Structure formats: structure tokens, C-alpha cells
Amino acid sequence: MEQGTVKWFNAEKGFGFIERENGDDVFVHFSAIQGDGFKSLDEGQAVTFDVEEGQRGPQAANVQKA
């Protein structure tokens, strides 16, 4: 798993971006967030995640709040 920081996340649209430790950004969809209840992330929040190849390039999977 990688570690990163939430760059931004739009809860209304259900997606955002995580900044990886290497400085690259990776797309995150709310469906990739682990846990119960409303799935959202806060700007600046530390997270761990896997990276999978999506239809439009790399995207975060198995996102967990650190």
C-alpha cells in the first residue's frame, strides 16, 4: 500500500485526487473508500491506498484513512 495526502475531494460529485509520496496525483472515486457510512475525504487528510489501472489511467483503490 502507498501513503498519500488528499489534495482535494468533492463530496457532491464523489471524486477527487490524492497526492502520492512521489508527488504525482492519483484519481480517487468515493466507491474506493473503505468503511461504513458516508464516504468522503477531507483536504490534507492522510490516507493509505493501492493503485490500479482504470479506464482513464491510474486510480486509487482500497482507500483507508490513516
Swiss-Prot record:
DNA-binding among keywords: yes
Signal peptide: none
Pfam family name, one: CSD
Induction: In response to low temperature.
CSD domain span: 4-63
Molecular function in Gene Ontology: DNA binding; nucleic acid binding
Quaternary data: Homodimer.
Protein name as catalogued: Cold shock-like protein CspLA
Source organism of this protein record: Listeria monocytogenes serovar 1/2a (strain ATCC BAA-679 / EGD-e)
Species lineage: Bacteria, Bacillati, Bacillota, Bacilli, Bacillales
